[in-house]
Amino acid sequence: MAKGVNQKLKLLYLMDILLEKTDENHGITMNEIISSLESYDVSAERKSIYRDIEELQRYGLDVLSYNNGRATYYHVASRLFEIAELKLLVD
């Protein structure tokens, strides 16, 4: 598979995708992750994304997975701030 222009940024883009497109109630599939990375001109295979998710977990990002039928969904379970805390900061 040809490498994209932004390959060195793959881990950061993956973190952004997980933070922006998921929460404890909404996950994202591996195919959706791959498509999202392609929009950043980053090519990736499932195995490399599994390793990247493990690295993000080691870094402290609370990435969890769950199965729904045949699909596995990934999501960020906890955030730096909860919605109520953000509202308090804004007020």
What are these regions (language model features)?
Residues M1-D91:
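Short, basic/aromatic recognition patches that contact phosphate-bearing ligands
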